[in-house]
């Protein structure tokens, strides 16, 4: 029986991983669809599509899937018609939260997001109710072995970035939103394709959470991220190491 239980646990974890992978693929495919329809289906002349293809590589999406999505979005039918949406509000402990999505039904998505906030100790606010607490930045990441700290900083500044930080995890270049595509392309021409390149909301200040509040906030974020319509969730909280260890136990 123990072996059977262990097998069930392994299969449950594998099933959860497969479900997560499928959800990641679905979100990236939506971005590819919107990116393709926002410009030309050629990534060399469509910066947003190029970024979407980079996202697909990050989640190890097969190249065939990407090509089919581009072909479908650029065809006469055009695929599903998605619009970009953004929601802002507060979670437990006054944590500010920004939710970005791509949806084919604004009313459905707004209802789901509002219900998630209400059910999990938060409140959905108006547009721009919390975004002033964040900076909208381009973030480009590279592994350590592509350049030294000084080389990356010099290249980043020359490309028009605001800063480059190097840690044991790699190089991270940040730039103004309007310079994102130019900076990314300049760095790519010098160091090759980045590990990741995306627009991000970075909080000006963070709320430090205890274990109970951290569980509540993470539950809300998990529910939001589980929606097919939601592409990304950003929040201004910080979880101390000891609390993170307790949550992982």
UniProtKB/Swiss-Prot annotation:
CC terms in the record's Gene Ontology section: cytosol
Pfam families recorded: TACO1_YebC_N, Transcrip_reg
Localization annotation: Cytoplasm
Similarity remark: Belongs to the TACO1 family.
HAMAP family the UniProt entry points to: Transcrip_reg_TACO1
Name the UniProt record assigns to this protein: Probable transcriptional regulatory protein GOX1679
NCBIfam families: PRK00110.1, PRK12378.1, YebC/PmpR family DNA-binding transcriptional regulator
UniProt-listed GO biological process terms: regulation of DNA-templated transcription
Cystine connections: none
Gene3D superfamilies named among the record's database cross-references: 1.10.10.200, 3.30.70.980
InterPro entries hit by this protein: Integrase-like_N, TACO1_YebC-like_2nd/3rd_dom, TACO1_YebC_N, Transcrip_reg_TACO1-like, Transcrip_reg_TACO1-like_dom3, YebC-like
Organism: Gluconobacter oxydans (strain 621H)
Keyword field contains Transcription regulation: yes
Keywords: Cytoplasm, DNA-binding, Transcription, Transcription regulation
């Amino acid at each position: 029986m123990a072996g059977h239980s262990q097998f069930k646990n392994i299969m449950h974890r594998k099933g959860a991983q497969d479900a997560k992978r499928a959800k990641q693929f679905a979100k990236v495919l939506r971005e590819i669809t919107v990116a393709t329809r926002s410009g030309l289906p050629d990534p060399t002349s469509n910066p947003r599509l190029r970024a979407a293809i980079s996202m697909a590589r990050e989640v190890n999406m097969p190249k065939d899937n990407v090509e089919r999505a581009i072909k479908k979005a650029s065809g006469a039918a055009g695929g599903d018609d998605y619009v970009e949406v953004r929601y802002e509000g507060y979670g437990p402990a006054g944590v500010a939260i920004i939710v970005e999505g791509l949806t084919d039904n604004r009313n459905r998505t707004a209802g789901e997001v509002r219900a998630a906030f209400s059910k999990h100790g938060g409140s959905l606010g108006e547009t721009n109710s919390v975004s002033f607490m964040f900076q909208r930045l381009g973030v480009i990441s590279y592994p350590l072995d592509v350049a030294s700290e000084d080389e990356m900083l010099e290249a980043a500044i020359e490309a028009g970035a605001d800063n480059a930080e190097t840690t044991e995890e790699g190089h991270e270049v940040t730039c103004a939103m309007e310079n994102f595509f130019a900076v990314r392309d300049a760095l790519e021409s010098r160091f090759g394709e980045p590990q990741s390149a995306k627009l991000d909301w970075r909080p000006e200040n963070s709320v430090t959470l205890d274990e109970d509040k951290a569980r509540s906030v993470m539950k809300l974020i998990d529910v939001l991220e589980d929606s097919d319509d939601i592409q990304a969730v950003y929040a201004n909280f910080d979880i101390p190491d000891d609390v993170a260890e307790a949550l992982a136990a």
